[in-house]
């Protein structure tokens, strides 16, 4: 009898210890707890503290697309930049990563660009195909990190909220000033160009850099303004696709543009290229998935020639 009691007490002790260990599992931690303890999220942690959102990430039922430190740095957001940014800006960025309900990767529809409303009221676009998930072109590198108040999906990019329509976003980038000048010059003869680029969309814009315009014979704004508006309109519409296509949605093949001609897209492990009908070589996409309210912008290093 004494042996039986000893074994029974030992069993209860083991079960009690097992129960204590279970309470410390990730599923018993809040989203805020996981962010605070995971070494990949030191910059996310700093942003959460800056925006004072720790309590918000400890309650409710949420989904958080969590950028790693590498993702923050790739967006130019190191610790100094996060701490120097206005609270409203950091809050807006963070809210663009949060959904107001727990959504596991298995619950996401297998589709391109499913529109989802974030906690901040903005829109993000989730793509799921062959089991891989991306959000606005940011890839989910680890899905379904469960917490007591929701789930975390780790992403490889910061999902920035749009800063305006396609023209407004381009206008804020000094490296795209000749593109903006070309849009304005084309609009003087064909208002439909500006209307399309500032309208509701959705669009994809392959945006040539200033260096790309220089190489195509447009040395400066004066050269742009000396060109025929109809010529510029024809070229610009050849850079616009009447659909929202993130880099993760691009596939090898021809794509029909708003000019009605086709460009040829090639996707490889080294990146994405786009070739116009009269280009001798393909343009490289040098910056992808810049989100505007009406478009996604991919910066290219050549002007595409129809």
Predicted features and spans:
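Mature, structured domains of secreted/extracytosolic soluble proteins
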Residues: 2-8, 20-306
């Amino acid at each position: 009898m004494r042996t039986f009691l000893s074994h029974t007490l030992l069993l209860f002790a083991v079960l009690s210890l097992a129960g204590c260990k279970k309470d410390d599992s990730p599923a018993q931690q809040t989203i805020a707890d996981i962010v605070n303890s995971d070494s990949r999220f030191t910059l996310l942690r700093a942003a959460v503290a800056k925006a004072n959102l720790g309590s918000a990430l400890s309650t409710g039922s949420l989904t958080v697309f969590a950028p790693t430190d590498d993702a923050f740095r790739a967006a130019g957001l190191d610790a100094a930049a996060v701490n120097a940014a206005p609270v409203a800006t950091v809050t807006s960025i963070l809210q663009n990563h949060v959904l107001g309900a727990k959504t596991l990767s298995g619950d996401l529809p297998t589709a391109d660009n499913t529109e989802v409303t974030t906690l901040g009221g903005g829109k993000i676009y989730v793509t799921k195909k062959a089991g891989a998930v991306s959000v606005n072109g940011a890839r989910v590198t680890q899905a379904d990190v469960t917490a007591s108040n929701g789930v975390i999906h780790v992403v490889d990019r910061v999902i920035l909220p749009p800063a305006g329509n396609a023209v407004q976003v381009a206008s804020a980038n000094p490296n795209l000033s000749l593109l903006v000048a070309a849009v304005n010059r084309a609009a003087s003869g064909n208002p439909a160009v500006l209307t399309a680029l500032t309208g509701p969309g959705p669009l994809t814009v392959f945006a040539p850099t200033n260096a790309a315009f220089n190489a195509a014979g447009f040395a400066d704004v004066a050269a742009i303004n000396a060109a025929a508006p109809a010529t510029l309109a024809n070229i610009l519409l050849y850079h616009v696709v009447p659909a929202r296509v993130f880099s993760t949605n691009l596939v090898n093949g021809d794509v029909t543009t708003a000019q009605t001609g086709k460009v040829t897209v090639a996707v490889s492990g080294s990146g994405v290229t786009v070739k116009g009908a009269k280009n001798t070589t393909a343009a490289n996409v040098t910056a992808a998935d810049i989100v505007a309210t009406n478009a996604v912008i991919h910066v290219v290093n050549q002007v595409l020639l129809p």
